[in-house]
Amino acid sequence: AQGVAFKDEIMGRLIRFVSAHEVGHTIGLPHNMGSSFAYPVDSLRSASFTQKYGTAPSIMDYARFNYIAQPGDEGVALMPNIGPYDKHAVRWGYRPILEANTPDDEKPILDAWILKHQNDPMYRFGKQQFGVIDPSSQTEDLGDNAIKASKYGIANLKRIVPNLIEWTAEDGKTYEDLEILYGQVLSQFNRYMGHVSSNIGGVYEYYKTYDQEGAVYTHVDREYQKACLKFIQEELFKTPYWLIDTNLSNKIEFDGTVDRIRVNQARTLNNILDFGRMGRMIENEALHGNKAYSLTQMMTDLRRGIWSELYSQENIDPYRRNLQRAYLDRLEYLMTESQEPVSPLMRRYSNQTRVQVSQSDIRAVVRAQLRNLKQTIS
């Protein structure tokens, strides 16, 4: 769909999967944001796999578009279908159990249906989160590796940006469509940053009952967390010049390019330097020692990346200077502010690690980073 208007065939398929999703809600199915984590990333480039399984095992996930597919991946499905999880959930909820005379008689049979698929990721349920703690249960993400999936997604965005003017061109029209689509590219890029950064200090949640083995909550692997921060440093904190196209920006605005990059960088930076995330990293180290990606190590890696010019002696461009100021602003915030309370309305739905900041290690770690930075600068 290299343009603003979709063909009727594509629009029909879009309506079909959105309608199926909403019908799922009407029969009692909640969002299943953990569904898409079941598929290996590269399987979503396979025509045979995606034609059979779609983009996720459940239509109730937000796995709307296959951003992993690359040019040349012929026949790859780009949209979700009703999947094995959906059929299983509907069967569990609605299939008559004729041999049961009472609800208590039904329970062991229903439990057996669940246990039959307990080790199959296609049948996993992951709740919708307002404040991501479990990075495997996010909206709009695909596949089992956020770094790999996001690299494919960014590769596609890099192909889109140089063509936006041509794809939106129409004699007699303004550049409004160009502005809208460029904004959508930025939004999608920001989603990828969120998908990856949520792994830092992340904790997986896999529902279990007493008769199932293993932990319900597991911290994200140390090396993967480190890799996620490295990805953010390389793809976002190093100025993403591919998003800066003067031939495009001079058609949609008189200013805004520099600040737009600042906003996107600061948003992800603040997401990483979140009180709750930092609190989980402290707890992970307390529980697992050297196996954890400690808050001190993460903060050191972050500082060295954002202030890399102090070591390389490279020039600091305006975008990087803005990022460095945002870093200082955020550290000031961490030293002087406390965690914002959750409103009573959102308390039921919000995932948030509560931290008593003044009595935690957070400010001690931040203070040490500021001292190290001061020494490096001087």
State each model region's role:
Residues F17-N32:
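Active-site recognition of the HExxH zinc-binding catalytic motif
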Residues M11, P30, A38-Y39:
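Active-site and adjacent substrate-binding regions of carbohydrate-active enzymes
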Residues A5, S36-S378:
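Conserved catalytic/binding loops enriched for acidic/polar residues
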Residues Q2-S19:
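Short pre-active-site segment immediately N-terminal to the catalytic Zn-binding motif
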